[in-house]
Amino acid sequence: MGYLVKLFKLVVWMLVIGLFSIPSLVSYVIFYDTVIPHSVIQYPVYFNYTTGLNFPTAEVRLDHFSIDPRLPGTSLLQIKMPHSPRNSAMGNFMVSVDFQDRNQRSLKQVKRTVLLPHRSPIHEYLKLIVCSPLYFMGILEETDIVNVRLFESETFAKSFNSITTLSVRFSVKNTPAQAIVKIYSKDIEFYEATLAFASKLHGMRWFMYTHKVSAFLVFTSLFWFTGITSTIITYLIVSSTSETKATRR
């Protein structure tokens, strides 16, 4: 008989643990989705070479901008360029990006000087000899990828209107809606360009994003313990109230 009582208690405890584990998991998912923004988002940049323009210009629609504009972030313009004599002889050139809101008002303007990485002729010849089989097979390409750092640890917004709990799409007054990208050179040759944004996480956000398993165990246990404690306290209060009423009767 004692064995059955112990087994019954074990089953009850397992049911309690199971019942409180589901809300704990759901709570952590909601908490993670609310606290952690999308870390990186990229947009392709398509430049316009229409006759009459002095330099290549692109209008990038920042649809579904899921980076929290209140958090410090980094923005990069990545340009994939062929390692051609024309690009090598071009020297320095300027890049500008104008971030605008939905009403086409400028939020932030950035201008940067860009220079292709220099390589000596000896370095180029040695690389061509060593990597020639990979070039013939199409595994390697004679390209240069230039990363133009537009800004770092800066924010678009200082105040916000509302945040939706189950989404990382923020209704923020100064959220960028588009970016006007200009390259002040008609001599440049490139394959493609990408505008990228990345959130810079600190403190708890950094811990939750970089240590996902540990954060999951810690916060899920915390939510589970909170649920169990609240239930026990509520049960004790209700039981004591019921006993008091029964005694008065």
Curated annotation (Swiss-Prot):
Nucleotidyltransferase among keywords: no
InterPro entries: Seipin (IPR009617)
GO process annotations (BP): lipid droplet formation; lipid droplet organization; lipid metabolic process; lipid storage
GO terms under cellular component: endoplasmic reticulum; endoplasmic reticulum membrane
Compartment(s): Endoplasmic reticulum membrane
Swiss-Prot/TrEMBL keywords: Endoplasmic reticulum, Lipid metabolism, Membrane, Transmembrane, Transmembrane helix
Stretches of the chain found on the membrane's Cytoplasmic side: 1-10, 234-249
Main location: endoplasmic reticulum
Keyword check for Heme: no
Residue ranges of the TM segments: 11-31, 213-233
CDD domains in alphabetical order: Seipin_BSCL2_like (cd23995)
Lumenal topological segments: 32-212
Entry membrane topology: Multi-pass membrane protein
Domain of life: Eukaryota
One family name in Pfam for this protein: Seipin
PANTHER family reported for this sequence: BERNARDINELLI-SEIP CONGENITAL LIPODYSTROPHY 2 HOMOLOG BSCL2 PROTEIN (PTHR21212), SEIPIN (PTHR21212:SF0)
Similarity remark: Belongs to the seipin family.
Function: Involved in lipid metabolism and lipid droplet (LD) morphology, number, and size. Facilitates initiation of LD formation, and ensures that vectorial budding of LDs from the ER is directed towards the cytoplasm.
Identification of the protein by name: Seipin homolog
Organism whose genome encodes this protein: Schizosaccharomyces pombe (strain 972 / ATCC 24843) (Fission yeast)
